[in-house]
Amino acid sequence: MASTFRSLRNYNYRLWAGGAIVSNIGTWMQRTAQDWLVLTELTHHSATAVGIVMSLQFGPQMLLLPLTGHVADHFDRRKVLLATQAAMGLLALCLGLLTVTGHVQLWHVYGFALLLGCVTAFDAPARQTFVSDLVGESDLPNAVALNSTSFNAARMVGPAITGLLIASVGTGWVFLINALSFVPVLGALRMLRQDELHRRPTASQARGGLLDGFRYVWKRPDLKAALVMLFLIGAFGLNFPIFISTMSVGAFHAGAGQYGVLSSTMAIGSVTGTLMAARRARPRLAILLGAASVFGIGCALGAVMPNAVMFGVMLVAIGASAQTFTTSTNSLVQISTEPAMRGRVIAILLAIFLGTTPLGAPVVGWVADRFCPRWALGVGAASGFAAALVGLLYLVRHRNLRIHLRSGRPRYSIDAPQPVLHGTPPLQ
């Protein structure tokens, strides 16, 4: 247990994590309320509209990629986060006031989603790489996993609270509460002991621009395999707002309370997955392959569940496998990338993770509208199986994967990874 939470021994990380979990709960409350507002109050159960909101919110990750990684590598990440977190709180406040006063329209939600996406495009790579400023290299995989645990613990609590709040006071107050939730994380950023931060190479030492980040990834078959797998699942598999909202309303005819419970149920699996990842000293690419396979199976089974209770059980497996996959991918890429390149490579990772959602969300939303929500989950299952195939091909081509029987059970073995650029350890 001590090894699972070892990063919390660090004062700066402990302070940051405490503020972040409050903000994360508010963020998940807003996400849940926003989807419900669009699906049930501003449209007549339009999954396509929810997909458009997701596209606007995550699209800037791709469009602003030339700038976001550069900012994360060349500017003080603490100051960047102070600016972005304050801006996100202000946007939540404005949307909340519009909703509470009864003036909100669908185009308002579209506009705020786009603005939030632009701010998040700068916030996400700075926030992800800021972890390496808070802890040493030896604790980095653990800190990354605990960050994901915090995010998914908030996913467990936030939607459940949101369902109750929507039923009692309405969606607008959820947005206002989210605006207040940014106060603790802003306070934590101000209170950090700056002399204890782990300094990275300065802007003058960091090499080149975003193009160098792409060149760096291109020369790394291990990174390419991990990022292609992330693209497939990120674009077509991680559309949980569409999956859960449309299954709740379309397949099970549920209300806001049950929708919130289903969202929280998946988060139980997500927390389990991230805690498992936190225990590993160094994740391996083979773990990504296994997690992608389980994700595909979970989505396929979830698509045929006859009632909300059984669907909720499958959401636990889907959440655990999805977070094992994404957390392990994040850790693998961070620890195997040179510190001077980390911001740009993480910006590429986040652009794929979040920015490909605009490509897949409208497709998944259209499938849910044109056919049914169960077919949309089938798209998610296909993405998991395709990602697993990419990982398998990498291990066969570059690591000489061999499968054999030992004591009547199948076992696998792979060759040791070869050294790569500048002595950076490759993915295992």
Q: What function would you assign to each model-found segment?
A:
Residues 1-427:
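Alpha-helical transmembrane-bundle signature of multi-pass membrane transport and export proteins
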